[in-house]
């Protein structure tokens, strides 16, 4: 993947890959799915951002993909953050 990014000249725009696997989910509750995969403890909130935007909670992954996919390579790039919550 890193070689492909360098060939396309996208190294500076996207940075280095994180090494996380890519899964395909068309209808899922993304934050709950990711909390399980990342082994986040109860009481920790997960926030997923796409293009510096927090998508609507009820929005399906297919809709998020169609709205925010990269026009160059067709991938959906996500950033996530966790925060401890009370309760």
Swiss-Prot record:
One of its GO terms (biological process) is autophagosome assembly. One of its GO terms (molecular function) is phosphatidylethanolamine binding. Residues 1-30 are annotated as: Disordered. The C-terminal Gly is amidated with phosphatidylethanolamine by an activating system similar to that for ubiquitin. It comes from the Eukaryota. Its main location: membrane. It is found in: Cytoplasmic vesicle, Autophagosome membrane; Vacuole membrane; Cytoplasm, Cytoskeleton. Signal peptide: none annotated. The keyword Translocase does not apply. Ubiquitin-like modifier involved in autophagosomes formation. May mediate the delivery of the autophagosomes to the vacuole via the microtubule cytoskeleton. Interacts with ATG4. This is Putative autophagy-related protein 8E. It comes from Oryza sativa subsp. japonica (Rice). The gene is ATG8E.
